[in-house]
Amino acid sequence: MSDVQVHQLYIHGRYVEATSGKTFNSINPANGEIIATLQQASEQDIEAAVKSAQQGQKIWAAMTAMERSRILRRAVDILRERNDELARLETLDTGKAYSETSTVDIVTGADVLEYYAGLATAIQGEQVPLRESSFFYTRREPLGVVAGIGAWNYPIQIALWKSAPALAAGNAMIFKPSETTPLTALKLAEIYTEAGLPDGVFNVVQGAGREIGQWLTEHPVIEKISFTGGVETGKKVMASAAGSTLKEVTMELGGKSPLIICEDADLNRAADIAVMANFFSSGQVCTNGTRVFVPKSRLADFEKAVVERVKRIRIGDPMAEDTNFGPLTSFPHMEKVLSFIESGKQQGAKVLIGGGRATEGELAKGAYVLPTVFSDCTDQMAIVQEEIFGPVMSILSYETEEEVIQRANDTTFGLAAGVVTQDISRAHRIIHQIEAGICWINTWGESPAEMPVGGYKQSGVGRENGLTTLGHYTRIKSIQVELGDYQSIF
């Protein structure tokens, strides 16, 4: 371990020694090797990060919107210049295929930052006349210091999705990356500093355990929490934020999304969409369409088409250019996914392909799970009810449109949904009845910077991306002006 780099915290534009005396390791899930050791933040370090953020935010908010925009655009340029380097690090840390991280993760994160850099100058209030001698106007002001808590599946993309609107609106952000995949968030902090962001405007405090998240959610200075993660943790974060200082929250939580294949769907297109909706990023996407509803009349042909495509998935070393399916992000998560697969078998679902761990050759060293497709599924099975967050597709048959809509909505989640059909009227009719915040027709998975994303029900609160998200990072001040005499009743 002598050649393993030790990473400090990133506070006030530089790396600083953590005061906890504790460390944790980042593990390469492709082979189980330690790739980095990270110092863990203490409560004292959180206080230092908050004070730093307060100082930096005052400087940042005092800049013109155009100045802030230019700095954020410089960060975009640096991200794109360093795309391949960052993608390699993301692949080492997450296990995601380099063919994916190099074309999606940094690229889409930079797109979101560029989008909000352009919107920084568009934040404005309004002026409304009340009568000849009086009017009021509004100002949209930054919240101040906000915190982001990231998930492990899209580390740098999530850090950018959270920081971009926050910084564009004039806030400072303290970001806690997942302890499983913390490395690229630290690189992002370096890039922000290089681009000219004032010290303290983006601080990174990493650590294992729940204490850091709790210190952030309960801190009286922090005005907002943006969290991405599981439902149960999200509920605790939200309760803690409300119980401390009534903080604003954005919650991007779990999903168990339905993909409805209609009777008139092009079978090849439907199978392509289903495979992408389940096995992209090794199945570790919160919006995955893991409940695939297929008409009974087309079930056999659809299952055959899906299996043919799954056989073409290239599992292997995530750094290899031809690999498009890497390991899961951690060994504990692999065990969780495998337990769900065993549950599916025990509850009577039929394995069409996959169904276990990948152990061929070098794959045995990593957290690899075979792309798995279950048929003969019922709505009551655990693999259909619960979020697995892995490469597990459940195929369910249906007979009528009314039936499939009811079953698709029969879940506590409401993150995403999709419909595949050649009848555009049917597509809209179904989608308008589905209880989900992100919906796709004849496609799946794209989340452009301009599109607000977020869930219904227990899948989340608030939105990320799009114009509406800027409102989550500002507050409105109303000012009335009287030009005439003031008449008192006393």
From Swiss-Prot:
Its cofactor is K(+). It is an enzyme of class 1 (oxidoreductase). The record marks 248 as: Seems to be a necessary countercharge to the potassium cations. It comes from the Bacteria. GO terms for molecular function: betaine-aldehyde dehydrogenase (NAD+) activity; metal ion binding. Gene3D superfamilies: Aldehyde Dehydrogenase, Chain A, domain 1 (3.40.605.10), Aldehyde Dehydrogenase, Chain A, domain 2 (3.40.309.10). Keywords: Metal-binding, NAD, NADP, Oxidation, Oxidoreductase, Potassium. Its EC number is 1.2.1.8. The modification Cysteine sulfenic acid (-SOH) is found at residue 286. It catalyses: betaine aldehyde + NAD(+) + H2O = glycine betaine + NADH + 2 H(+). InterPro entries: Ald_DH/histidinol_DH (IPR016161), Ald_DH_C (IPR016163), Ald_DH_CS_CYS (IPR016160), Ald_DH_CS_GLU (IPR029510), Ald_DH_N (IPR016162), Aldehyde_DH_dom (IPR015590), BADH (IPR011264). K(+) 1 binds at residues 26-27, 93. The keyword Transmembrane helix does not apply. GO terms for biological process: glycine betaine biosynthetic process from choline. Pathway: Amine and polyamine biosynthesis; betaine biosynthesis via choline pathway; betaine from betaine aldehyde: step 1/1. It holds the Pfam family Aldedh. Binds 2 potassium ions per subunit. Dimer of dimers. Belongs to the aldehyde dehydrogenase family. Involved in the biosynthesis of the osmoprotectant glycine betaine. Catalyzes the irreversible oxidation of betaine aldehyde to the corresponding acid. This is Betaine aldehyde dehydrogenase. The lineage of its organism: Bacteria, Pseudomonadati, Pseudomonadota, Gammaproteobacteria, Moraxellales.
